[in-house]
């Protein structure tokens, strides 16, 4: 039993007892762990700022027999741009949920810089594109990265061609089946050449260059669907945050349409009869 310091990203927080919170943390030093923040729900608690979800904090923890306790919490970065934007916040929460679901306790320290970078990118770049980059690189770090270059059947390189049949992609198998072997896998879905090219690029590029990419919404939806299906096969289910992101997207799309309809209705009502 001892005190130790840790850099932590707060993945999740839930009420515990009358005034405490149980935190799920991703630490640079020890990976993912759970800790209790006692009295943090009281308005006067000094732990409040450093234990909020989606916060990068410097913590002092007491290592007990069964549960670790946060004794000090100082925020390093609160990511105001994420908390102030519902779309960015939804994507940041989804990243945290993915790390929580896919990494076991007391492991995943190598995911700390990936998630921290992801939250920084979300503060600047479009959420859907950052989410795709993060999901692919998370799969890669966890050893689940799909095979994007070679045919899983024969091992031959899969070329990207603007014309001709598309290669097949299997989330269950974890990658591509080229045209040379596709006849043996008629049940597989197909992947667009542009989507395959984007996935390869996202895996290799410098994340700081994300703003230079010009990706249409249709292609981005295709890539997102490929990654989500791959994650479902590894996590045995959906992420709850995905439905939140879809709901937020629908509401933002519908709002301008409703305003336009309301404006037209107002104009119609003002016309002389």
Swiss-Prot record:
The keyword DNA repair applies. Signal peptide: none annotated. Keywords: DNA damage, DNA recombination, DNA repair. Residues 252-273 have a biased composition (Basic and acidic residues). One of its GO terms (cellular component) is bacterial nucleoid. The keyword DNA damage applies. InterPro entries: ARFGAP/RecO (IPR037278), DNA_rep/recomb_RecO_N (IPR022572), NA-bd_OB-fold (IPR012340), RecO (IPR003717), RecO_C (IPR042242). One of its GO terms (biological process) is double-strand break repair. Residues 249-273 are annotated as: Disordered. Involved in DNA repair and RecF pathway recombination. Belongs to the RecO family. This is DNA repair protein RecO. It comes from Heliobacterium modesticaldum (strain ATCC 51547 / Ice1). The lineage of its organism: Bacteria, Bacillati, Bacillota, Clostridia, Eubacteriales. The gene is recO.
């Amino acid at each position: 039993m001892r005190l130790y310091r840790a850099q932590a990203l707060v993945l999740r927080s839930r009420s515990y007892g009358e005034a405490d919170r149980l935190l799920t943390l991703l630490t640079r030093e020890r990976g993912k762990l759970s800790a209790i923040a006692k009295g943090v729900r009281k308005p006067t608690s000094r732990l409040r700022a450093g234990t909020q979800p989606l916060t990068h904090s410097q913590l002092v923890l007491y290592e007990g027999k069964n549960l670790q306790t946060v004794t000090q919490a100082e925020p390093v970065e609160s990511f105001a741009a994420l908390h102030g934007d519902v779309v960015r916040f939804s994507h940041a929460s989804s990243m945290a949920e993915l790390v929580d679901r896919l990494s076991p306790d007391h492991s995943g320290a190598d995911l700390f810089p990936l998630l921290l970078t992801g939250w920084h990118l979300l503060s600047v770049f479009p959420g859907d594109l950052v989410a795709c980059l993060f999901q692919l690189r998370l799969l890669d770090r966890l050893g689940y990265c799909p095979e994007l270059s070679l045919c899983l059947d024969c091992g031959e390189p899969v070329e990207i061609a603007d014309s001709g049949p598309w290669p097949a992609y299997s989330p269950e198998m974890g990658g591509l089946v080229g045209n040379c072997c596709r006849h043996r896998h008629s049940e597989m879905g197909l992947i667009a050449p542009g989507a395959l090219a984007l996935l390869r690029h996202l895996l290799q590029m410098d994340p700081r260059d994300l703003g230079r990419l010009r990706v249409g919404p249709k292609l981005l939806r295709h890539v997102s669907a490929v990654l989500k299906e791959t994650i479902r096969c590894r996590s045995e289910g959906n992420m709850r945050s995905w439905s939140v992101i879809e709901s937020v997207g629908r509401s933002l799309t519908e709002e301008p349409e409703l305003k336009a309809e309301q404006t037209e209705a107002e104009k119609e009502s003002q016309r002389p009869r």
